[in-house]
Amino acid sequence: MSALPRSLREVNVEKLSQERFDVLVLGGGINGASSAAALAARGARAALVDRSDFASATSQESSNLVWGGIKYLEAYEIGLVRKLCRARNALLRSYPSSVREIRFFTSHTKGFRWPLWMLLVGSWLYWLLGGGFTRRPRLLTLRDIAREEPVVALDGLDGGFEYSDAYLPDNDARFVWNLVRTALDHGCAAANYVESLGSRREGEEWVTTARDLVSGRELSIRSRVLVNACGPYADGVNERAGVSTAHRHVLSKGIHLIVNRVTPSGRALTFFADDGRLFFVVPMGSRSCIGTTDTPADSPEVAVTAEDRRFVLENINKRLRLARPLTEADVVAERCGVRPLVVDAAGAGGRDWMQLSRRHVIESDPVKRHVTIFGGKLTDCLNVGQELCDEARRLGVALPRADQAWFGEPDASARQRFFDEAGRMGLDALAPPGAAERLWRRFGAGALGLLEAIRKDASAAQEVVEGGAVLRCEVEEAARGEMVVALDDFLRRRTAMAQVVRREDLRGSPGLREVCRILFGEGGQARLAEYFGDVSAPPERAGWRRAP
């Protein structure tokens, strides 16, 4: 009897132990994924590992916004705003399906610290700093607000304004996975659930001792350059490796509550919360994502508290005119994470930490050939990838394809080919509305293979869990090629199902049991029980949800 074929993940774990790499990237969030994709596409022998799943920390907890940082204008960080606006524009151009312009409908309260006219001027400055790439801002009268967004409560308002930024129609973690997929396609050895136990210098190399948390196997990964892209965990990783840096992180906790859609307009609603911070209601499929908070955190391990929920619900209920106030019973799901904010290692310089920006700093030790990525956010990921390539070159890594494009969707002709094929086979009649657009957005050129699967078996076009907006063929593709190890990887990161379907509805769904069967075979029932906490995970999987 022949052995079963090895999974994509198993193949990559083997590569990690057998090959020597130019660069090993620790941490598979947005910074690590963009770095690995850029390096691999340009010809470096790159490797990427994460202690948990890809994008399982900060990169799965954002507002799903791709924005130029309009709030940083208040701190006069004009250069940063211009840079972020350009980064946003580059993502809009490169990912026209995955990153979309969205209008922000902002109301203004009488007596706010900045008068309405000044905020309107700020929105025009923001538009100009972005090169006029998006639709122009406009002033909103109370009549405009009442007509266009009747859900907004008018009490205490004297008007508002509207401007543009961008957002991710799917989810942040899926965007990160697609960058990991790009890295894999260019030859990167990448694997999730590979824990770095420590790194040391041996001659001209870094030797990183790691453990495959699935098999328990220990391995040594050799690289010329070591990149720490562990986000909020980066300081601890550096300390364990004996690396001193001029920067460090302070952490800010932010939470979001997801509820049934509060407006059908497709806009993001923007308010100033009671603490003066920007406060959003962002579309998320059939739901709305409301937040965020900004509180200091001592550790990356955070959770939503009763006080957090109360703050978000009280603020949104004050500002919306709903049939009844939102309560905790209306919460479909929650998002909670920390923002790693970069400061000088000697301290934050006495500056109000709430005024710290999401800028990134890439710090390199040319003697040790060690690089740390501090701070950052999804909007800036293309800059991080480019700067990491520049830094790798300075550290002696050859990039034979230095001009190779490493990001973006397939060109318009490939997109048209896919939609023509979807039309010819009558996908709209076989699948829920919008399926073609979602498949292209999530899989790019690979979506043609999913159409072929549907052609062979029409049941592959069926939605697997009601309201989850995921087709059976997507589950099958995840089982084949998306390194799904735990059920949470699929429900929370490869898809947004766990964010738009209530947990109790997932538990009772026959479709979810079928998802587990496709993903895990005979082990599906055990994975399902682990996900809902009905049984404890076995020892080899007990630590999966901890730090990278």
Task: Kindly give the residue locations of the regions a language model identified.
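Core beta-strand elements of the Rossmann-like FAD/NAD(P) dinucleotide-binding domain
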Residues: E19-F21, G216-V225
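Dinucleotide-binding Rossmann-like beta1-alpha1 core, especially the glycine-rich loop
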Residues: N64-E148
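C-terminal catalytic lobe of FAD-dependent flavoproteins
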Residues: D172-N178, T182, S244-C289, T295-P433, ...
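Flavin (primarily FAD) binding-site architecture
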Residues: N228-V243
